[in-house]
Amino acid sequence: MNNIVDTAIEAIVAREILDSRGRPTIEAEVHLLSGAVGLAQVPSGASTGTFEAHELRDKDKSRYGGKGVLKAVHNVNEILAPKLIDLDALNQELIDRTMIALDGSGNKSNLGANAILAVSLAAARAGAESLGIPLYRYLGGPLANLLPVPLMNVINGGAHASNNVDFQEFMIVPVGATSFREALRWGAEVFATLSEVLHDKGLLTGVGDEGGFAPNLESNQVALELLVAAIEKAGYKPGEQVALALDVAASEFYKEGQYVYDGRPHAPTEFIDYLGQLVDQYPIVSIEDGLHEEDWQHWQLLTQKVGSRVQLVGDDLFVTNATRLQKGIQEKAGNAILIKLNQIGSLTETLETIDLGTRNGFRSVISHRSGETEDTTIADLAVATRAGQIKTGSLCRSERVAKYNRLLRIEDELGDRAVYAGAVGLGPK
């Protein structure tokens, strides 16, 4: 015992809590000998990629419709905790590799990616707390000073809303701002103006899972027209000051080799042409999941067609997985990767995937999930990794705004050293 440092793990406790959709998720605390405590909560997705790490649910229909996470909680408290006690919280990789080895599967299906990630993030927070430094500095070192451009999801469709809009997210991107605080204000003003624009047209202003409006619209183009109108009415220049971004989530409407939108099926090449036309007609700077997660051939074609003009982000395509990203790099499919901690299930693997992308000219977009909590880790992660971009929903719902407010505090803390990524943080490298 004499060799145990005060940053050694003394206790780990997990519990079942609720996410922003009222569904169970897991929270973990990591306690160190020094008295430092790290707390982390794990999000959950609605439109999940086939190749994501396994989220363990109880499947006991008598509790939460089978969506409980007591098995994951048990796995933390009874299996992971005993093996992690006395490990140094500052050795993040050892902690994560130990948990991955204990799970023993390729996709964390035995213990659950949600169980492993909760401990992984809580350990990092405990480590930062023990050193008396913020999480972004703990993970990113002295160069962690780049505030990300927010891609703000203000119109929801697809799997994130109960409406007839095909694409999942229509986002505003304040590329022309000079600070994160200014970017956030611009976004909030456009969001408020969009509410007025929708109301004036007799459209619904109820919001979806991520806080964006979810009206029934005639087409995807109508959504884009509404955003341009709101940007202009708020007093900003579309493209120059506030640009647009899309999460197509094409895997959600891919049927038997065709893309079914606007009420009928379309061939992949026809759909690629359609996306190209949208880029021509609107100030779009980023398209996420423009094609199905296994349609590698047409991802190459899409990248050849518009990849020099816009950012093409793989979410379901890459699922924060270094192996799948390596394939994308080799096949020249896309030019950016969406980073979701719970897709891969540990902090170490997440950082490795970001590093692989950076070394190969792929930008990273740090992202929330549709089922979120008040946990703000992704805000710190975006600054720590100098990713330059973050997706954390709309300008309402406190589980979304919590991340924006955390970034405001980080910007204040950095003072004159803070740099806002702006337009340079987006697009193909």
From Swiss-Prot:
| One GO MF term attached to the UniProt entry | phosphopyruvate hydratase activity
Q: Where, in this chain's numbering, is (2R)-2-phosphoglycerate bound? A: Q168, K340, R369, S370, K391
Biological or metabolic pathway of the protein: Carbohydrate degradation; glycolysis; pyruvate from D-glyceraldehyde 3-phosphate: step 4/5
The catalytic activity, as recorded, is: (2R)-2-phosphoglycerate = phosphoenolpyruvate + H2O
Q: For this protein, what is the EC number?
A: 4.2.1.11
Q: Which residues bind Mg(2+)?
A: D247, E288, D315
Q: Which cofactor does it need?
A: Mg(2+)
Q: Which GO terms describe its biological process?
A: glycolytic process
Question: What keywords are annotated for this sequence in UniProt?
Answer: Cytoplasm, Glycolysis, Lyase, Magnesium, Metal-binding, Secreted
The note on the cofactor says: Binds a second Mg(2+) ion via substrate during catalysis.
Q: What does this protein do?
A: Catalyzes the reversible conversion of 2-phosphoglycerate (2-PG) into phosphoenolpyruvate (PEP). It is essential for the degradation of carbohydrates via glycolysis.
Indicate what this protein is called per its UniProt record: Enolase
The gene is eno
